[in-house]
Amino acid sequence: MVKSTSKDAQDLFRSLRSAYSATPTNLKIIDLYVVFAVFTALIQVVYMALVGSFPFNSFLSGVLSCIGTAVLAVCLRIQVNKENKEFKDLAPERAFADFVLCNLVLHLVIINFLG
């Protein structure tokens, strides 16, 4: 029973890797950016757990900035993906401009929250 489960998991990872290798480079770069943003948020949470969160507004601002940026990057990835039929008429330049504008608004709110 355990061997078949292990074999199924290996087959699953192999199929995911082969499917992801066909992903365009621009989507892989966006994926890397999302992973970096989430990893940065996790580092901030671990730091807060170990050291403390004295300036709590700063901690919240940093984590919300990372998570908000990751969410906006996922939205960009959805819009730029050529296989997505919902955003077929949307130009990649327009999607990137929306991403930049939303990031600007997000970070203005974050800076305002810092006080």
UniProtKB/Swiss-Prot annotation:
Q: Which GO terms describe its biological process?
A: protein glycosylation
Q: What is its main location?
A: endoplasmic reticulum
A Pfam family annotated for this UniProt entry: DAD
Keyword annotations from UniProtKB, A to Z: Apoptosis, Endoplasmic reticulum, Membrane, Transmembrane, Transmembrane helix
Give the transmembrane region(s): 32-52, 56-76, 95-115
Give a short account of what the protein does. Subunit of the oligosaccharyl transferase (OST) complex that catalyzes the initial transfer of a defined glycan (Glc(3)Man(9)GlcNAc(2) in eukaryotes) from the lipid carrier dolichol-pyrophosphate to an asparagine residue within an Asn-X-Ser/Thr consensus motif in nascent polypeptide chains, the first step in protein N-glycosylation. N-glycosylation occurs cotranslationally and the complex associates with the Sec61 complex at the channel-forming translocon complex that mediates protein translocation across the endoplasmic reticulum (ER). All subunits are required for a maximal enzyme activity.
Assembly: Component of the oligosaccharyltransferase (OST) complex.
- Stated family: Belongs to the DAD/OST2 family.
Q: What is this protein called?
A: Dolichyl-diphosphooligosaccharide--protein glycosyltransferase subunit DAD1
Q: Give the source species.
A: Arabidopsis thaliana
Gene name on record? DAD1
